[in-house]
Amino acid sequence: PFKDPNQQVKNQQLKESCALTVLLGSHHRVYYYTGIPTETAPPTIKTTYFKPNGGIRDIIIAKMKEVAQRKASGELGAKDNVAVLIKATPNSTYKDMVDMLDEMNINEVPVFAIVDISPVELEFLAVPEADATKP
């Protein structure tokens, strides 16, 4: 039977400490933030790329280590896992999406989903994306 890849994330309530949101932008830029933003606390969006050192892979590895340490300390339960939400902007490329899915596989991310980017997130990216188009 067909299994909705987003269903696993829908069925589990994301814990703020386990959430990593990845926004695929233009010019192979990868924006990301941790946690779950609210109206009163917008996210702090950071920028990286698909590069061997210091890229999105290192961000994912760091998040997985952080969650593992919190599990070991008892702060998180045994079933709590990193959950990566992948969102593509209209200016991102198919290759970037494939590369991001490869990163999920390489890093053995237990829970991830491809979801639509929100209008609010597009607003957050308006300035960094405008800067990306400048030579």
Where are these regions (language model features)?
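Charged, alpha-helix-enriched surfaces in structured cytosolic catalytic cores
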Residues: S17, K51, G55, S92-D99
